[in-house]
Amino acid sequence: MTSTSQQFLAALTEYPDGALGPRELCVSCVKVLPVDRAALTIGGASTTWEPLSATDETAARIEAHQVVTGEGPAVDAAERGGPVLVDDLSLEFDRWPGFTTALGRDAYGAMFAFPLQIGAIAIGVLDLYRNEPVPIEPDELTAMLAVADIVTMVLMSRPPLADVDANAADSWWTPSPSSSEIHQATGMVVAQLSAPPRVAYLRLRAHAFAQDRPLTEVAREVIERRLRFDPDDDPLPELAN
């Protein structure tokens, strides 16, 4: 076990029984790694995405932009099954035009995305951020990979610590109110379009992207029957891939 892994495990033991959750995992990442913020998003290349937690509002906004645009380091990391390392987000417009445009003033610094997976089982992505556009060093990459492995094990309800309640992890998967709204709205759009859930989700996301609005707001309009999708309307091409 690397020294960084030991430091990370030690940071997790600082939390009392039952208090170790997604936010604590993110905060512990910042404590032991050379990064300024961290965030967790649950989902995969063929599923919907849900931000799970973040250390601050900036990280939370960036995660939300990835969910809405379907672009960004986390999306690519999930699709490739390997880390995506970005030294400077401000230079990545050609790579992720929708994502970087949506970022606006947040398009700065470095971002490193690590898929959370064990074998063929993938559950999400750990995103790590630096305020400055500083390239990652080999030893830093090794440390981040080690921490991502531990985060994966904890999120998969296999806590590596003897004093962590194994049942506590189960409650992390309870959808937040906003996530529940997105799921409910997706189901309603499935009925409206007579389409698979992923297509319905893409239509929701495309509408949010086109209007530069949070996905949760669009979902709420669908639930309240103030917005209905027409099968004859095509989603934005860049979001339909």
Task: Identify the function of each model-found stretch.
Residues L141-T152:
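Allosteric cytosolic regulatory segments
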Residues M1-V68, R220-N241:
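Intrinsically disordered, low-complexity terminal regulatory regions
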Residues P160-N241:
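Signal-transducing coiled-coil/dimerization helices and immediately adjacent hinge/linker segments
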Residues T4, T152-P160, P177:
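Signal-transducing alpha-helical linker
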Residues V125-V134, D139:
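Short beta-strand-to-loop transition segments that serve as allosteric relay/switch motifs
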Residues G43, A59-R95, T101-G109:
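Regulatory sensory and allosteric helical modules in signal-transduction proteins
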Residues A110-Q117:
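Short hydrophobic beta-strand micro-motif common in sensory/regulatory domains
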